[in-house]
Amino acid sequence: MLLQAAVQNRNVPLASSASYSRLLRCRSPVVSVAALSKKTAAIVCSISQVYGYGTVDYERRPIVQWNAIYKKISLMEKPELGAASVLNQWEKAGRKLTKWELCRVVKELRKYKRANQALEVYDWMNNRGERFRLSASDAAIQLDLIGKVRGIPDAEEFFLQLPENFKDRRVYGSLLNAYVRAKSREKAEALLNTMRDKGYALHPLPFNVMMTLYMNLREYDKVDAMVFEMKQKDIRLDIYSYNIWLSSCGSLGSVEKMELVYQQMKSDVSIYPNWTTFSTMATMYIKMGETEKAEDALRKVEARITGRNRIPYHYLLSLYGSLGNKKELYRVWHVYKSVVPSIPNLGYHALVSSLVRMGDIEGAEKVYEEWLPVKSSYDPRIPNLLMNAYVKNDQLETAEGLFDHMVEMGGKPSSSTWEILAVGHTRKRCISEALTCLRNAFSAEGSSNWRPKVLMLSGFFKLCEEESDVTSKEAVLELLRQSGDLEDKSYLALIDVDENRTVNNSEIDAHETDALLTQLQDDL
């Protein structure tokens, strides 16, 4: 098979440039470890979409299909050129873009988590204010995107510069969502009070957003308090309110309370439980070991799928993987392929992830090879799953071979890719090679949204101490300083590193590195 050939011929450079395997060679003895097979169920929390596409435009619906523009932007070979390059090229070809088209493109980009490109489209429109009249709804969407891409300070500055007549409940809700995403509790609670005073907290959205914050902070009693306030003020719970409430009850480990909420949901004539309702319940049942109830909930998920909606299938694939039910996993996969014309990278990712978690590496490799000729783009998250499994099984050379294959195929290694390899070299006690991988992780595209796992750093520092390698330890500390990670005191405390401390540990704890790889697998 293609993957096997790539791994078996690692001495032959697969990429036009020097292959990774020739740059990093470690011949130290492998730390003997029994790989852990612990399976963990990913917690799924239904979070309301803060804003849908609601821009009202005076323009007539254009004949030109917006999805042609979307595809050009989303499949750019050089995304660093920005969405503006695509839009300028489109207009130079004599095709005038309309606001309706551009807002529809933004909607699709947001749907697939391409916030940076969506914001670039809005920036392009803002630079042509004489052509594109933007509304308060547009401002709310832009604020949400700015918060995701540029951070809270820029989002606050954008909010302050808006005309007062633009600062409606949608814009306030967008800023609230930005605070919640950043887990900025004090600012979120203060803004909610302002929204209460202005009469902007008379609908479910701000309460749903705050419930999400308290869920993320594991303050489940606060979720109940939000529900109580809504009922006190006769604010009807919507489907998102119920789904978050269900997730909160499940996170407390209470089957009875979760099922009681579901009964309330069923008795609410304005609510029809959707597939998210049952995927949330299935997730919680899996977490609590209620296999039969989980499988019943998953059947209800499947029954609620309408049209060619792909997302529910991704949840089904992931959750059947958490159950370890390979038969149902493949059945859903074949159904999925029969109802949609093409499966996106996320679909293949869900299947590969489940197979890896079930220990079926050979099956995961087959799916990887099936994905290669049909992929929309080379997504490093998919091979990362396999590389992580190889490293966990002490097959670093196999992981390096897949890395070389990724580069040959035009894939761009992510920070997580390099982190996985760094773990592999740490397990083999190769400090120099692990340090090289960490340097590459900090310089990889998108590294500003990444920081190394606590267990990764603890293991590396422990190895440095055992080998009396102060220089390598200091090199990683400098990388952390430059990235700003050392400014986070809670993160620093978890790493438990004192630059002047020397610890005499007998050996690297193999179980710790296995736990790290399990954590990496869940994040991938």
Swiss-Prot record:
PPR repeats lie at residues 168-202, 203-237, 238-268, 274-304, 309-339, 344-378, 379-413. Signal peptide: none annotated. Keywords: Repeat. GO terms for molecular function: mRNA binding. Disulfide bonds: none annotated. The keyword Iron does not apply. SUPFAM superfamilies: TPR-like. Pfam families: PPR (PF01535), PPR_3 (PF13812). GO terms for cellular component: chloroplast. Belongs to the PPR family. P subfamily. NCBIfam families: PPR. This is Pentatricopeptide repeat-containing protein At1g02150. The lineage of its organism: Eukaryota, Viridiplantae, Streptophyta, Embryophyta, Tracheophyta.
